[in-house]
Each structure stands twice: as structure tokens, then as C-alpha cells.
A protein has these predicted regions:
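Active-site histidine-anchored catalytic micro-motif
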Residues: 1-169
């Protein structure tokens, strides 16, 4: 999100802002939101991954079938891998789908990919295939597949990396 006073991008987006900006999400699934924090993704550390793991476990124990983690793109690949490895550390698999998503462009820009990525992530979390423990299906990352709207890619959470700072594919 852009701070229009300074012109700088800030890490201050509230969950309700995401839902209000994307009302079609509520038509996809029953949504419950938990805010774990607002920070730059490159400030993520192992204790943050533990918090994400705990929140996922709590959500699954409360009956959630899928989870969407909204995350900055700079270190999303580290977090999606950490969560996948965290679940498999004891030879287990998550009881449902865990989807990471974000946006290459600020959510308040007209060219933002945040809405489409979030909608695709919610759809996958709600209706995607059952997690079976195959390599790479414990967590997935869903982002734009090309620079055009209309198609999102579903990628293994342990096999992704950021290729560009603002390009949408």
C-alpha cells in the first residue's frame, strides 16, 4: 500500500481492507480472518514461521478446510517452504490446503494483481485437490501466470522463487 503523504510503500494493510476491496471473495467460501502481523516480508524470521504454523494448526483444528496466507513477495518462497517442511517434519501432511499469495504491485494501484491472486488463492484453498503428501503439495503459491489478467499459476511452495520486483508473471 502506498503512503500518499510520503510516496513510500508501507506494510500496513488490514484484513478488512482486503475483504472490502474484493467482495467477490465472500461468495467463494466462508471466510475467517486472523491477522498475525504487518511487516516487510524480508523481516520474517523462524519465529514468524512458527506463528504461521500454529495459526494454520489452530484453523484446521477449528474445522477449516483450507488456509490462505497473504504474504509479501520478497520472501514468500522462504515462508512457503518453511511451512511445508514444518508440516512434514514429523512425517505428516497438513489436513487441508495451505495457499500463499501476494501481489507484485501495491493493492491500491490500478495495475495491482492482488485481487485476482487473492480470489484464485481462496478458490484453491476451498476447492483445490486434497493434499496427499506428494512433493510440493503441502503448500502452494498462487500468483499471476502472465503479465495479463485472467490466469493464475499454482506452484509448489517448496519450488518457487521471486524473479522480478514488479512484473506480474
Amino acid at each position: 500500500k502506498v503512503d500518499y503523504t510520503t510516496g513510500a510503500v508501507i506494510a500496513r494493510l488490514e484484513p478488512d481492507e482486503l475483504l472490502d476491496a474484493n467482495p467477490e471473495i465472500a461468495k467463494q467460501a466462508c471466510i475467517s480472518v486472523i491477522k498475525l502481523g504487518n511487516m516487510w516480508s524480508d523481516d520474517m524470521r523462524p519465529q514468524h514461521w512458527n506463528s504461521i504454523l500454529s495459526a494454520c494448526e489452530d484453523a484446521f483444528n477449528s474445522g477449516s478446510e483450507g488456509i490462505v496466507v497473504c504474504h509479501g513477495t520478497d520472501s514468500m518462497h522462504f515462508s512457503s517452504s518453511a511451512i511445508a517442511f514444518g508440516w512434514s517434519g514429523n512425517g505428516g501432511i497438513p489436513p487441508g490446503r495451505i495457499v500463499f499469495t501476494g501481489s507484485q504491485r501495491s493493492s491500491d494501484r490500478g495495475s495491482s494483481d492482488s485481487g485476482e491472486n487473492l480470489l484464485a488463492a481462496v478458490h484453491w484453498a476451498a476447492y483445490g485437490p486434497k493434499v496427499n503428501g506428494d512433493i510440493g503439495d503441502s503448500t502452494v503459491v498462487i500468483m499471476h501466470e502472465t503479465s495479463a489478467d485472467g490466469t493464475c499459476a499454482v506452484l509448489s511452495g517448496v519450488g518457487v522463487r521471486k524473479m522480478h520486483t514488479s512484473k506480474r508473471d
